[in-house]
Amino acid sequence: MKTSRLACFTLTAALLGAPALAADKVSFKDPTGDDNGPGTYKYPTDPVYKRGSFDLTDFSLAKKGDKLDVSLGFNTTLEDPWKTGSGFSVQMAFIFIDTDGKEGSGSTESLPGLNVKFAPEFAWDKVIVISPQGASRVKAEVGSKAGAVKDNVLVPDRVKGSGRKITATVNAPGLQGEPSQWRYQVLIQSNEGFPAGNDLMTRKVNEYEGQHRFGGGNDGECDPHVVDMLAGAGKGDASEVKAQHEALAFECGEEGVVKKQATLTMVGGEAAPAEKK
């Protein structure tokens, strides 16, 4: 009888543990103090933009069936001064994913308002938009502004900020492969309730900072509107600050015409730091 009960218990434990063991998760780190884009950007002057609000510290993604669980860490405690109900207000993030690693497969253009592109060998297949605004508003903006890539934009079912973390759950049926084989780029921006023109709810970077505008860039559209990002190997070491500044380097001509656009790569892939949960 004792042997039978022990065998039953062991089998039950194994069955309960099986799904967790099958989940595939990747994690990356980012150095602190690099929330200055190409090295020159400054925060808006309004006090709601606390120091560290756009300073990415870590990113993780886990695939569980048809869903993706995402976590983003920041270098300050999140607040919701604009009462969005999401637990945060000023942050916004774009998680670009290259699922097949094939040059020429996917898109090299980013989304409207970011003013960056991707190198051909890092063309993206899917992008997750993390916003404190409701999913219906985000989906409407994507539908009207993302053009030909709108079907490759994933909007989370759930987004929540708590402490220093923003977590989200994304429904992604049919997404092929495992997270440890994918490549990633996380771009940190600021949630804009009244975006200019075709911008996808992103905040402008100007030459001089203002109450609700970043400074240190250009008043045209030749500068990358990215405050922080993953760089290097995504381990969080000091060399990644320089790598970020180089990736976001840009040149503007007269009247804000693009002379050199910021061109990005990704982290992860075959060498991604994966962990089995």
Walk through the language-model features, giving the residues of each.
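Bacterial N-terminal signal peptides that target proteins for export
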Residues: 1-9
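Hydrophobic helical h-region of N-terminal Sec-dependent signal peptides
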Residues: 9-16
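Short alpha-helical segments and helix-capping/turn motifs at coil-helix boundaries
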Residues: 11, 53-57, 79-81, 152-153, ...
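Sec/Tat signal peptide C-region and signal peptidase I cleavage site
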Residues: 18-22
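Acidic/polar low-complexity flexible segments
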Residues: 23-27, 99-115, 176-277
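Surface-exposed, glycine/proline- and aromatic-rich loop segments on solvent-exposed faces
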Residues: 24-25, 44-132, 263-276
